[in-house]
Amino acid sequence: MTMLVVAIGNPGRQYTWTRHNIGFLCADRLLQEFSGVHFKETPKLFSDIAKVESSQGTVIFIKPRTYVNLSGKAVLAVKEYYNIATDRILVLADDVNQPFGKVRLRQSAGGGGHKGIKSITQSLGSNDYWQLRLGVGRPQREDVELSDFVLGQFTEEEQIGIQSLFIEAWALFSQWCSGTQTA
């Protein structure tokens, strides 16, 4: 069985350590558990792609190169190319509605205002995929726009705390792969 893990984020070094790219960072961390596997640029599928074989089947990781708000274009291209069922897709996305460090696994969920999730749902014509929502919290100050916040760099405290988030993400990812998760 083939599974697809979609990391939501923006391509480019300037975005690497931003809250909106926590999906990319999480995918990189998950992939480290499979030694010797790296992302390769795949222009025809609008993504960087890595494939791993696990005891549960093939897992394809993608980091779309379309920017967050257009993630659906890449997801649909990869889904169709590899003939992956929608319910075998897991999307790793930042979540401003969860406190920093909280990780939540859900299926057939709404987007919570996330434009990348909205793009994926529109492109697939369904929300029957799984979401691993990675809490990044909200701005502490009212004068900070939400868009500036998610495109902002992690604080030193968040950079330290992100490791715990990745540990929780690995546990939920493993459950999802094995089919033992609960929505």
UniProtKB/Swiss-Prot annotation:
PROSITE patterns: PEPT_TRNA_HYDROL_1
GO molecular function, one term: peptidyl-tRNA hydrolase activity
GO CC term, one of those recorded: cytoplasm
Keyword Acetylation: no
Reaction catalysed by this enzyme: an N-acyl-L-alpha-aminoacyl-tRNA + H2O = an N-acyl-L-amino acid + a tRNA + H(+)
Broad EC category: hydrolase
EC number assigned by the record: 3.1.1.29
Family listed: Belongs to the PTH family.
UniProt protein name: Peptidyl-tRNA hydrolase
Native source species: Chlamydia felis (strain Fe/C-56)
